[in-house]
Amino acid sequence: MANRSAAKAEALAQELDCRAVDNAAVAAGADYIFLGVKPYMVAGLMEKIGPVLAARKDRFVLVSMAAALTIPDLRERGCGDWPLIRIMPNTPSAIGEGVIFYTCDGVTAEEEAAFLENMAGAGRLLPLDDHLMDAGSAVAGCGPAFVDLFIEAMADGGVACGLTRPMAMECAAQTLIGAARLMLETGRHPGALKDAVCSPGGATIQGVRALEAGGFRSAVMEAVIAAYEKSAEMK
């Protein structure tokens, strides 16, 4: 692995039990070369490693994590005609609970299968058309920040009602995890699960009423759309 900071590369190499090298060494020998740079840095990186890649006689796959850059954008910035996978991971990937959207171009079925096998530990890998990657990123890439804000607000409510901060935070986070897993594992619509908790005249439906009065659904939708529109501006 390589990093702009040699010290950071060494630290990460020790943590991940791999070798710290420079970009040229990665470009010369890796089967899957991850381009983990900001969008504006892709062209400069490819200008440096392009000659090394061009000299290779074996197949390799470029994997881009640059937000907002489509497959054509990446090719215009130096990725040429080489096999290319565009991915959009999110922060929970760090603990194996991520959502990783991906789209392939010029990649064989065997190369895609090997990529999926090696990335399986990061979370759920979902194929997505290139033109929809920004939409996926607005939900899964930006979503953790929205969810964190919700957890913090829910915990604040718990504190206001008398819970300690640690208890309220743990309770809010675990409740979100449990509700999400219940939906995923049962396949039930979230609206149906919500209705199952809302007893007639009960406390939950009053809380739902307060959320609706505050524009909760609209605010969440607008957050996703705003993130999507910003991604479009970043191209």
Which residues does each predicted region cover?
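NAD(P)-binding Rossmann-fold cofactor-contacting core
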Residues: 1-13
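Conserved beta-strand termini and adjacent loop/short-helix elements that scaffold enzyme active sites
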Residues: 2, 21-23, 87, 128-130
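Rossmann-like NAD(P)(H) cofactor-binding subdomain of soluble oxidoreductases
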Residues: 6, 15-16, 23-100
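Small-residue helix-packing motif on alpha-helices
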Residues: 9, 27, 42, 164-171, ...
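Internal alpha-helical scaffold of NAD(P)-dependent oxidoreductase catalytic cores
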Residues: 73-83, 99-136, 147-185, 230
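Short pre-catalytic strand/loop immediately N-terminal to key active-site residues, enriched for Gly-Thr
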Residues: 84-85, 133-138, 190-195
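NAD(P)-dependent Rossmann-like dehydrogenase/reductase catalytic/cofactor-binding core
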Residues: 173-235
